[in-house]
Amino acid sequence: MAVINPHINFNGNAEEAFTFYRSVLGGEFAKIMRFKDLGSEFPVEEKEAHKIMHIALRIGPNVLIGNDVPESMGRTNENENRSKISVRTESREEADRLFYGLSAGGQIEGPIGDTPWGSYFGCFRDKYGIEWIVEFDPSY
């Protein structure tokens, strides 16, 4: 069976964001690679050499992946809202912990609570501009 792993582009703060995500979601870094580690095959400006070329945070059976986008490739659209990262939890308590932890410093778009479709659900944009859904639904 295929596994879907979200991949997030950042404008230079991928390491900070992933350290924050790990502090809330748990897990371990499976890989951290900086642009300077690529050598001459992929030249970047010195000011961007320390930025993240690839970072992978293993969270249970899932992997959250990200990178910084070098300025030479253009900035990431921080207002893009075509997709969200959805986290399904095993309890209301876990949903609350993740919702309030990840939304700290961000903007809550839909407070967490019971919904007409029977789940415990909330959505927000975190302090890095990434949109999230946290949901507990005992039916799946």
Each model region followed by its residue ranges:
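Glyoxalase I/VOC metalloenzyme domain signal
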Residues: 1-110, 123-140
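Short, small/polar residue-rich loop motifs at catalytic or cofactor-binding pockets
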Residues: 51, 116-119
